[in-house]
Amino acid sequence: MSFVSSKIFAITGGASGIGAATCRLLAKRGAATLCVGDLCSENMKLLEKDIKKINPDTKVHCTVLDVSSSSNVDEWIQDIITTFGDLHGAANIAGIAQGAGLRQAPTILEDDDQQWKKVFQVNLDGVLYSTRAQVRAMKEFSSTNPGDRSIVNVASIASMSHMPDVFAYGTSKAGCAYFTTFEVTLFALGYFSNIMGMLEGITRTPMLPRFVPSAKTQEEVEETYKKEGFSVIEADDVARTIVWLLSEDSRPVFGANINVGACMP
């Protein structure tokens, strides 16, 4: 995993959960700079302290970022290029949940336009805006500073599971997974970067309780999933695969959407 050392990475949704776990592991593996974009600034100072303890040589650049705004994303990536001079890899992890058990069947009648748009603006539009800006930056530097460059888009096992009660979330994640597979044509045509996807399972993060709003405790949330046959994994479990995909160790893999954690079809 030393192949991530001395490199510059951009991580959306990087201040907590899977994003923060990815940042910590990249720092441990010797990344030069971590550019964290997150809508919530609450955990940024804590992340900076954690990274400093893990690797004092890793720089952390935190930005309040709304991935549903293409101009906001473009400005963020341009600021990374202006400040640090390159971009070697990116992980697009930012996303929002949709609570289950809140709608009566047929649930499509109770999913209003605003809810649908909000989920898609973050979970799908945000991935498009981020990937586009990252590819643009990587293309600019590929001729003068060649080398392996990777983008990892985090979708979800919900993209291939039958969960009609949260179909806006599942459909947005299915779009993210398909977008990632489709965009790999950039790699196949001999361009500068590799784009891969992640389908993470039920992961113990601050966002997990939002999927089960009826649960009063974290234990109730996890018990709900266990009754449905899902195991609960840690954010670090997902981060290890993301960092592997960002490293040169994953060079033979491209266009894949890799499942991490248990999945029910």
Curated annotation (Swiss-Prot):
The keyword Chloroplast does not apply. The lineage of its organism: Eukaryota, Fungi, Dikarya, Ascomycota, Pezizomycotina. Homotetramer. It comes from Trichophyton verrucosum (strain HKI 0517). Residues 1-20 form the signal peptide. Chanoclavine-I dehydrogenase; part of the gene cluster that mediates the biosynthesis of fungal ergot alkaloid. DmaW catalyzes the first step of ergot alkaloid biosynthesis by condensing dimethylallyl diphosphate (DMAP) and tryptophan to form 4-dimethylallyl-L-tryptophan. The second step is catalyzed by the methyltransferase easF that methylates 4-dimethylallyl-L-tryptophan in the presence of S-adenosyl-L-methionine, resulting in the formation of 4-dimethylallyl-L-abrine. GO terms for molecular function: oxidoreductase activity. It comes from the Eukaryota. SUPFAM superfamilies: NAD(P)-binding Rossmann-fold domains. This is Chanoclavine-I dehydrogenase easD. Its EC number is 1.1.1.332.
